[in-house]
Amino acid sequence: MKIKTSHLIFVQGILLVVFLFITAWFNRFSADDYLFIGRLRDFSFFEFYEKLYLTWNGRWTYNFAILFFMKFSEYKYFLFAFNGLSFLLLFYSIYLVLAALNKKYETNFNIKTVLLYAIVFIGVFFFFTHFTGQSWFWISASLAYLWSCIFFLFGLSSWLKQTHRFFDYLVIIVCCLYIGGSNEVLALLTILILFVSFFFKGNTVLKAITSIVMLGSISVNYFSVGTTFRDNLTPNLPFVELVLYVGYGTVKYVFIDFYKTILPAIIFGFPFFILGTKSSVQLYKNFNIKKDLFKTLIFVFLVVFINQFIVIYALGGLAPDRSTITSSLFSSLAIVRFMFLYGIHSKEIKINFKPALLIVVVLMLVFNGVFYRIHKNYSQSVDERTIVILSNNKNEPIRLKKLNNAGYLNSAEITADSTNFLNQHLKYGLGVEQQIILQEN
């Protein structure tokens, strides 16, 4: 049987899906997860929800979501089911966006192609994301970061429709509410884009409603007592230090970590170039590879810069990798757009894509094999540690061995300091009285 490029792209996508679900299978609770488990054991849902909003953060939609899901944490396969739900929602939201674009620009790709490339985009987004262990797999963070991106994509799919019905407005409103109450960076960047969009033609009513709802939601977040309390705990950087921190964060994201994130994302997204070469529609006739590549890079740089500025200004320190997922989403969309358009305007180039795709498939096979072993060993070490803690009846500190490498998962590792919040959360979540300490080698 003759192997087609579509077959290789399909295998590439399947290997990604296998990786995501196997990794989810080996996922374990970590850090703040144990705090939520303990609090929900000692307080009612609404007591703890009120406490979070008034004393810790104003992320009102995120707080509701995390408490809702963590009510099911006692079930054995809860984390696997949660991660699986996240991936399915992400897949469906991307599919809706691609389907809307397919209809809007009349590219006439069949549903199988749209479904396949929704998986390919997940791969681009995944590899573009810094520290996926926190923003994708760690439930305490993914509900704020990955899920806000999912809601953004659902809203975008409704926005892209040529005619907007009541249901589309409802979807957009719900999405804006969730984003504003969970991911401040994504909310502010969306508001900025909406502001710019008012200078162009379009549905003014839709723009106004979206802007008002997003502003309202983030206001409930920002002006909360909990957010004010948390802001008082973080330092205010002098202007020079702020510039240096933002500059370093931007350079690190774009250049220093290029080989770990952007390069793998581009390689995995190569099928979008191939898809462009097969398109029967000539989109963007003024496309110029140098100019449009420059515009794409400038867009990515600006998004990363704004993302870094918002987080660093608020925290008074370097931005946590999980907080850059907004940059990863917008950059993934920009890179995929460029590759597709480049493919459309490169139809005269006669290239055999199969060797390149075969290399990607082989790399994904190796990738799956390596990280299967890493994640399996990590999960076993966490399970063994949990057994040691729960079976210890001695009234003395419990000294634990170091966990194995967590790979793409968020590590549940603690410290040698029994008073560290990681140690205290683990102790509280498991309901033990003894101090828990990481044994120093």
Language-model features: locations:
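Transmembrane catalytic cores of multi-pass membrane glycosyltransferases
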Residues: 24-84, 139, 180-323
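Signature aromatic-anchored transmembrane alpha helix within multi-pass, membrane-resident enzymes
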Residues: 290-297, 342-367
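Membrane-interfacial, low-structure loops and terminal tails that flank and connect transmembrane helices
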Residues: 1, 101-111, 279-293, 349
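Alpha-helical transmembrane segments
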Residues: 6-20, 116-123, 171-174, 210-216, ...
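Intrinsically disordered, polar/acidic, low-complexity terminal segments
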Residues: 4-57, 70-116, 353-441
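Transmembrane alpha-helical segments
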Residues: 90-101, 149-160, 191-199, 271, ...
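Membrane-interface micro-motifs in multi-pass membrane enzymes
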Residues: 32, 113-160, 183, 304-338
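Short hydrophobic alpha-helices at membrane interfaces in multi-pass membrane enzymes
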Residues: 158-177, 205-209
